[in-house]
Curated annotation (Swiss-Prot):
Record-listed substrate binding positions: 97, 145, 192-196, 304-308
Catalytic reaction equation(s): tRNA(Gly) + glycine + ATP = glycyl-tRNA(Gly) + AMP + diphosphate
Protein name in the entry: Glycine--tRNA ligase
GO molecular function annotations of the record: ATP binding; glycine-tRNA ligase activity; protein dimerization activity
Cited InterPro entries: aa-tRNA-synt_IIb, aa-tRNA-synth_II, aa-tRNA-synth_II/BPL/LPL, Anticodon-bd, Anticodon-bd_dom_sf, Gly-tRNA_synthase/POLG2, Gly_tRNA_ligase_bac, GlyRS-like_core
Gene label: glyQS
Stated role: Catalyzes the attachment of glycine to tRNA(Gly).
Enzyme class: ligase
Length: 445
């Protein structure tokens, strides 16, 4: 099992994730994504969007505002019900979520005793003001989830897209929660990104579609992101764990170095959200669906798939990370990312920094850069350059040597196996495309 300290070290050293405001001492639970981190996030988002929107003719996209009218959060139940229970240790003053610790045992921080305060409720929403006057009339919240922006746009999307039940609305965006405790690197933070889809169905079809989306989402992690199946599992919520809006819920959990934790939730939200907004807005017809074939009118039920993008980044790094002992006794660190997710698809190396080789290398770079994100490197030994690319997950390295001048061939080295092939420059594009398309993951890594 990979160690969390190895992931954090790699993330900072190679430019995936940096501590936010580090030059000023850092801000707890806040992280900046570096050059490789933004590429990995972008690639995961791209695959999620493709799997949700492009591969389903009845799912469309939305990008709703972070700031919305505060009535929306009162209607959704977040103002009154979106809270965690917290306790403080009276000895060391540390604060904990009550459901994260055993209150009958010693404080996990100071170990002195179980001298805790009584649990008290703590609302997780960030409140701020819009305008020049800070009073109750200018209060707004940073959204704690992206879902409500979808629900209040139900009628807009339905009418403008000419959709029929069942259909879905997908969205990727930032959400904010004033977490009592931020921990485990980028896993639990106050600012994060969600990839959510709300699927609207006839009430009588809710169970059928709930089962469909459970399996669909698990397949996404295994078949698209190539996450190890033995590190994924379903976990059902019992009645005491359900959110205020949910009738049923399953989590997809991944085995992180700190244990199994949620990366995506699949929820049967019933008609709770649409009914609440119909009531609070006093516009019931806006949230009602009229089936023109059956003449039936009803408020649709909703199945939600809610994945954490930032958690998916951490999961992907943990799952891809490996350390290998080589035959010469050396060790290499490899990120076995699927090529679709790798920040760079190709690295191009002139064997030495001589103009006759760098000119060819630059020409190949320009020929391929429209279709592949490429890293160009002409410093250091070839062995060191290979190791640098292994660490960041680049699947293919292309070396231009003196034979290239003679026969227009290059050496293509594959990351996982370290095998090398001579390929004609004119065939390089199609070769890399085919290799990515036919990539097979070894889950026994």
């Amino acid at each position: 099992m990979v160690r969390m300290e190895d992931i954090i070290s790699l993330a900072k050293r190679k430019g995936f994730v940096f501590q936010s405001s580090e030059v000023y001492g850092g801000l707890s639970g806040a992280w900046d994504y570096g050059p490789l981190g933004v590429e990995l996030k972008k690639n995961i988002k791209k695959e999620w969007w493709k799997s949700m929107v492009y591969l389903h003719e009845n799912i469309v996209g939305l990008d709703s505002a972070i700031f919305m009218r505060p009535e929306i959060w009162r209607a959704s139940g977040h103002v009154d019900g979106f809270s965690d229970s917290m306790v403080d240790c009276k000895d060391c003053k540390s604060r904990f979520r009550a459901d994260f610790i055993d209150l009958s045992k010693n404080c996990p921080n100071c170990k002195v005793g179980n001298n805790f305060t009584s649990p008290r409720s703590f609302n997780l929403m960030f409140k701020t003001h819009i305008g020049v006057v800070e009073d109750s009339s200018s209060e707004v919240y940073l959204r704690p989830e992206t879902a409500q922006g979808i629900f209040v746009n139900f009628r807009n999307v339905l009418d403008s897209s000419r959709l029929k039940i069942p259909f879905g609305i997908a969205q990727v965006g930032k959400a904010f929660r004033n977490e009592i405790v931020t921990k485990n690197f980028i896993f639990r933070t106050c600012e994060f990104e969600q990839m959510e889809m709300q699927f609207f169905v006839h009430p009588k079809q809710i169970d059928e579609w709930f089962c469909y989306w459970q399996q669909n989402r698990m397949n996404f992690f295994i078949e698209t992101l190539k996450i190890s199946p033995d590190r994924l599992r379903f976990k059902a919520h019992d009645s005491t764990q359900l959110a205020h809006y949910a009738k049923a819920a399953f989590d997809i959990e991944y085995e992180f170095p700190f244990g199994f934790q949620e990366v995506e939730g699949i929820h049967n939200r019933g008609n709770y959200d649409l009914t609440q907004h119909a009531k609070f807005s006093n516009k019931p017809k806006v949230f009602e669906y009229h089936d023109l074939l059956t003449k039936e009118k009803y408020v649709p039920y909703v199945i939600e798939t809610s994945a954490g993008l930032t958690r998916s980044v951490l999961m992907t790094l943990c799952d891809a990370y490996s350390e290998e002992e080589l035959s010469d006794g050396d060790k290499r660190i490899v990120l076995r990312l699927h090529p679709k997710l790798a920040p760079y698809k190709i690295a191009i190396f002139p064997l030495v920094k001589k103009v006759e080789l760098t000119e060819i290398a630059r020409r190949i770079y320009m020929e391929l850069c429209d279709d592949f994100h490429i890293f160009y490197d002409d410093s250091g030994t070839i062995g060191k350059r290979y190791r640098r690319q292994d660490e960041i997950g680049t699947p293919y390295c292309v070396t231009i040597d003196y034979n290239t001048i003679e026969d227009e061939t290059v050496t293509v080295r594959e990351r996982n196996s370290m095998t090398q092939k001579r390929i004609f420059i004119n065939d390089l594009y199609s070769y890399i495309k085919t290799e990515i398309l036919n990539y097979k993951e070894d889950f026994n890594k």
